[in-house]
Amino acid sequence: MAAGPNGLEEWVGSAYLFVESSLDKVVLSDAYAHQQQKVAMYGALQTALAESGGSPDVLQMLKIHRSDPQLIVQLRFSGRQACSRFLRAYREGALRATLQGCLARALALNSVPLQLELRAGAEQLDALLTNEERCLNCICAQKPDRLRDEELTELENALRNLTCGSAGGQGSDVQGTPAPLQSLAPSPPEEKPPPPQPGQTFLFQGQPIVNRPLNLQDQQKFARSVGLKWRKVGRSLQRSCRALRDPALDSLAYEYERDGLYEQAFQLLRRFVQAEGRRATLQRLVEALEENELTSLAEDLLGLANPDGSLA
């Protein structure tokens, strides 16, 4: 197949994920009708899907439908590898486990047991999961019939504002997700920097910059531009982040090799954010970029670069 604009093969498909609580007292479609809970639940879905399938460039939510008592999430897959990884996570129960934990935190409950169902067109894929090739063909046969819903863009902005707020709010895509397996090799304890305080700044090229936790847009900008140097940045970050210590970077490189440099870099920052929470700050990333002579990327990340390459 021909390569797409982002280097991804032109393999596109669509499926619907049906999500329902097993608890009578928890009706997800009703909870999603309330704006504050809607933002938190969107963040929970986004986090679980990113962990199971990859970045929004390869696995994207197009629309979230309310259908009492369920939520129905329309998904778009760009790339066979990402779809295969999602199917594996769904089949093995990893998606369900992650989503249950994320939704429980979003709704401030001890637990939210879920019933999931996956469909592509008329095919109910749960009965076909042992035949991955057939599932892939069913999903590929269903082309997305819409663009991303504008409401999801609004929810993404609201979620980003929560992430950047002074209090780590519910539904943040940087909170509460399980940290990945860490290296078994003994390592000295690192000094964890404190979370940023409201209005706290750091200096970049003599300019004061407001520090804040990293958000999804930061991760996407970094992944688009860092290229082969993502591992060098990872080595800088691992000095104060145990979750990135060896063999974590080699594992990321191997696991996402077929998805390309964008996905490897995106997953690096996603793992950093998962492990560090609100301590995964703009300042720490910018310092790692400067250390590796990636000043122009830091300028782009901070919004300081003009289109002609000069500082704003």
From Swiss-Prot:
Residues 222-289 are annotated as: Interaction with KRT14 and KRT18. GO terms for biological process: canonical NF-kappaB signal transduction; extrinsic apoptotic signaling pathway; positive regulation of canonical NF-kappaB signal transduction; positive regulation of cell migration; positive regulation of hair follicle development; positive regulation of inflammatory response; TRAIL-activated apoptotic signaling pathway; tumor necrosis factor-mediated signaling pathway. Residues 166-200 are annotated as: Disordered. GO terms for cellular component: cytoplasm; cytoskeleton; nucleus; plasma membrane; tumor necrosis factor receptor superfamily complex. A motif (Nuclear export signal) lies at residues 147-163. A motif (Nuclear localization signal) lies at residues 231-244. The keyword Acyltransferase does not apply. Adapter molecule for TNFRSF1A/TNFR1 that specifically associates with the cytoplasmic domain of activated TNFRSF1A/TNFR1 mediating its interaction with FADD. Overexpression of TRADD leads to two major TNF-induced responses, apoptosis and activation of NF-kappa-B. The nuclear form acts as a tumor suppressor by preventing ubiquitination and degradation of isoform p19ARF/ARF of CDKN2A by TRIP12: acts by interacting with TRIP12, leading to disrupt interaction between TRIP12 and isoform p19ARF/ARF of CDKN2A. This is Tumor necrosis factor receptor type 1-associated DEATH domain protein. It comes from Bos taurus (Bovine). The lineage of its organism: Eukaryota, Metazoa, Chordata, Craniata, Vertebrata. The gene is TRADD.
